[in-house]
């Protein structure tokens, strides 16, 4: 029997529901159970693909090409279970599907309403494809009381009645603020949040209380009394040094035991958390430090590069060093010297992005890394800027540019209008919609024998996740390689460049895909492991 755990939030957003869900999934896995994690987002966008990274954070891409919420990245990193298109849904997508059904006449002339049509669609999403899974964890985005979230709360309330007794568990994440002037922790926001949840028919089984200090016994007892839960169900969710210590911390608080108790499961084996303890130890007690500059255009919100930041942490774990990230807004190089920002770093990473703003700064960062022999990692847009830089400054092609920035006589980077996916030709109109029209998901690449990337991967055939609509123009291949960049990875049909590298540089690699999306703390991505290793070597030269 599949059991369902619904994770909701109250008081304020950004309390860490995604991390709590991922950590609980990891704890249940460590006890021998199979898990599946899903995210229900109440916003009206069909997916986050066209949303600003500064508003929404990163867009996490799955193997099957879905553009999803960044929380799915936490789910994958903590559990190792690959997410898919079926693990994230939005109000926009539900409404889109319902309206399409209505236009087809599927409702036979009936009035289409939020209840039952929208709530039924949400329930159908939650219950689908779970036959072989012990636990399904569903996180509801936003906070209780948000008007756009009401259909989701109503749907999970109905599921509590429709599923068998003991088949559902409701976990509510709240904030326990400490008021310095009063010298005490306040429980009233939590009480009101639970009151709001109960007013729509949901009684939480477990409360996870986010706090920055231990919860006094009296406050814990008070929360249990006024929120109608057992004292043992008031879980202290304190801040920790690293997110990879969260599974250990929640286990010590008894979260997994309490969840199993809600389901009436007895005699479950103790979780094996050895790998999490090792990871947390390596992060807390590194053998050294390196500094990596991330030269990006969305540095105002670090969540825009969430998977990237975590992949660097994973590379640090593999090399037993702490990776200190120096965030550099690429536009500063339009007016300031790159050396002022980059001369003290051990590696430079230029991540993906869209649009002309900040592009010249990224080109200058690539030039600095190439000429100063500093390890350079260009991802997606970062690879494209590295190619443009080399052709301008080494290849003598001063007009080298991208058609993304406007008309150019030297379209070194251009819009893709067709590509192959699973032996089928995919076409995109040059002036079509932006949403869902990129080259998305996992694609194979063939690596050159003897190349650095082939040595790093230990293979000449790889599969990586993509998210881009512009690509380095293959007609410039001879000029690119004459400028010193080896095209060491291409698509299986040989038509799309995937990887460039400089063979005689300490470490200079650009990739068209997003390797950060497949990195995990217990399985660091080979490129990030190698890049941080190169940064360690660079730090020893200073």
UniProtKB/Swiss-Prot annotation:
Q: Which GO terms describe its biological process?
A: 'de novo' CTP biosynthetic process; pyrimidine nucleobase biosynthetic process
Q: Which GO terms describe its cellular component?
A: cytosol
Q: Which domain of life is it from?
A: Bacteria
* Record Pfam families: CTP_synth_N, GATase
Q: Which InterPro entries does this chain map to?
A: Class_I_gatase-like, CTP_synthase, CTP_synthase_N, GATASE, GATase1_CTP_Synthase, P-loop_NTPase
Where's the active site on this chain?
A: 380, 514, 516
- Which residues are involved in binding ATP? 14-19, 71
Binding residue positions for UTP? 13, 186-191, 222
Keyword presence, Ligase: yes
Q: Where does Mg(2+) bind?
A: 71, 139
Activity regulation description: Allosterically activated by GTP, when glutamine is the substrate; GTP has no effect on the reaction when ammonia is the substrate. The allosteric effector GTP functions by stabilizing the protein conformation that binds the tetrahedral intermediate(s) formed during glutamine hydrolysis. Inhibited by the product CTP, via allosteric rather than competitive inhibition.
Region Amidoligase domain: list its residue ranges: 1-265
Q: Its biological function?
A: Catalyzes the ATP-dependent amination of UTP to CTP with either L-glutamine or ammonia as the source of nitrogen. Regulates intracellular CTP levels through interactions with the four ribonucleotide triphosphates.
Q: Which HAMAP family match?
A: PyrG
Binding partners and assembly: Homotetramer.
Question: Of which family is this protein a member?
Answer: Belongs to the CTP synthase family.
Q: What else is known?
A: CTPSs have evolved a hybrid strategy for distinguishing between UTP and CTP. The overlapping regions of the product feedback inhibitory and substrate sites recognize a common feature in both compounds, the triphosphate moiety. To differentiate isosteric substrate and product pyrimidine rings, an additional pocket far from the expected kinase/ligase catalytic site, specifically recognizes the cytosine and ribose portions of the product inhibitor.
Identify this protein by name. CTP synthase
Source organism per UniProt: Parvibaculum lavamentivorans (strain DS-1 / DSM 13023 / NCIMB 13966)
Taxonomic lineage: Bacteria, Pseudomonadati, Pseudomonadota, Alphaproteobacteria, Hyphomicrobiales
């Amino acid at each position: 029997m599949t059991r369902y755990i619904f994770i909701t939030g109250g008081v304020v957003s950004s309390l860490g529901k995604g991390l709590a869900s991922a950590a609980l999934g990891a704890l249940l896995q460590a006890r021998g159970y199979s898990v599946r994690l899903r995210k229900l987002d109440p916003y009206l966008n069909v997916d986050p693909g066209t949303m600003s990274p500064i508003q929404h954070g990163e867009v996490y891409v799955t193997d099957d090409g879905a553009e999803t919420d960044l929380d799915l990245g936490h789910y994958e990193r903590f559990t190792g279970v690959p997410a898919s298109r079926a693990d994230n849904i939005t109000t926009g997508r539900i409404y889109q599907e319902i309206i399409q059904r209505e236009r087809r006449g599927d409702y036979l002339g009936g009035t289409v309403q939020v209840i039952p049509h929208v709530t039924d669609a949400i329930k159908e999403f939650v219950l689908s494809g779970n036959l072989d899974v012990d636990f399904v964890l569903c996180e509801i985005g936003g906070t209780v009381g948000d008007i756009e979230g009401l259909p989701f709360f109503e749907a999970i309330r109905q599921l509590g009645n429709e599923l068998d007794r003991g088949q559902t568990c409701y976990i509510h994440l709240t904030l326990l603020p400490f008021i310095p002037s009063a010298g005490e922790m306040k429980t009233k926001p939590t009480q009101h949040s639970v009151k709001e949840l109960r007013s729509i028919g949901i009684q939480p089984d477990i409360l996870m209380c986010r706090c920055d200090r231990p919860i006094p016994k009296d406050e814990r007892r008070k929360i249990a009394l006024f929120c109608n839960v057992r004292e043992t169900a008031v879980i202290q969710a304190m801040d920790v040094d690293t997110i990879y210590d969260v599974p250990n911390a929640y286990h010590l608080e008894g979260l997994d035991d309490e969840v199993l108790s809600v389901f009436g499961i007895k005699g479950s084996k103790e979780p094996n958390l050895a790998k999490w303890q090792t990871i947390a130890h390596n992060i807390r007690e590194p053998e050294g430090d390196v500094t990596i500059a991330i030269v990006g255009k969305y540095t105002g919100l670090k969540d825009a590069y969430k998977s990237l930041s975590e992949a660097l942490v994973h590379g640090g774990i593999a090399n037993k060093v702490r990776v200190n990230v120096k965030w550099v807004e690429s536009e500063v190089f339009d007016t300031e010297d790159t050396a002022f920002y980059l001369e003290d770093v051990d590696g430079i990473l230029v991540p993906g992005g869209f649009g002309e703003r900040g592009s010249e700064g990224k080109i200058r960062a690539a030039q600095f890394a190439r000429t100063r022999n500093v390890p350079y990692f260009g991802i997606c847009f970062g690879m494209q800027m590295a190619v443009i830089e080399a052709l301008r400054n080494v290849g003598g092609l001063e007009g080298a540019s991208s058609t993304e920035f406007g008309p150019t006589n030297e379209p070194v980077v251009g819009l893709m209008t067709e590509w192959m996916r699973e032996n089928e030709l995919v076409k995109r109109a040059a002036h079509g919609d932006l949403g869902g029209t990129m080259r998305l998901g996992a694609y194979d690449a063939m690596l050159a024998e003897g190349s650095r990337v082939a040595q790093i991967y230990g293979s000449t055939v790889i599969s990586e996740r993509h998210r881009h609509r512009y690509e380095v123009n293959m007609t410039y291949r001879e000029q690119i390689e004459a400028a010193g960049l080896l095209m060491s990875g291409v698509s299986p049909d040989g038509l799309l460049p995937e990887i460039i590298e400089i063979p005689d540089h300490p470490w200079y690699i650009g990739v068209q895909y997003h390797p950060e999306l497949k990195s995990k703390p217990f399985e660091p991505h080979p490129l990030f492991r190698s890049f941080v290793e190169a940064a360690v070597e660079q730090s020893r030269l200073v």
